[in-house]
């Protein structure tokens, strides 16, 4: 995981370990309603270390849909699988994020692919506008 690599490769002294996310007692499958990594609690779990990101998420369209009880609303792990997380400054991440958005927003991905930005992205160039550059709370 990115957390394990942070500890081993980057030499960080403090990083998340298994029990930080999964707990150390009463561990449940992610599909269980009481699971710390299930959709009912994962924003809170991730927010223990990523408070700023969790706050931004709660104010986003996805966070608001989750608060309204939408079963279709994505949560942290919908786009950021805890065991496949990549650094946002990694080479392939910028290309990967377009595909992640397209998993749920396929009709918009098809339109994006027809634009200048989409064509450049398909060639592997990463310094180009992506979904979140225009469709983000940070605008």
Region spans (language model):
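Short sequence/structural segments immediately N-terminal
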Residues: 1-139
């Amino acid at each position: 995981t990115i957390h394990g690599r942070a500890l081993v490769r980057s030499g960080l002294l403090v990083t998340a370990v298994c029990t930080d996310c999964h707990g150390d007692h009463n561990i449940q499958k992610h599909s269980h309603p009481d699971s710390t990594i299930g959709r009912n609690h994962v924003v809170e779990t991730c927010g223990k270390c990523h408070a700023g990101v969790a706050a931004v998420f709660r104010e986003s369209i996805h966070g608001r849909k989750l608060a309204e009880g939408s079963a279709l609303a994505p949560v942290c792990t919908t786009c950021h699988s805890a065991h496949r997380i990549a650094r946002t400054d990694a080479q392939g991440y910028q290309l990967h994020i377009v595909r992640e958005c397209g998993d749920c927003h396929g009709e918009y991905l098809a339109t994006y692919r027809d634009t200048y930005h989409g064509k450049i992205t398909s060639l592997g160039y990463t310094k180009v506008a992506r979904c979140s550059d225009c469709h983000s709370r940070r605008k």
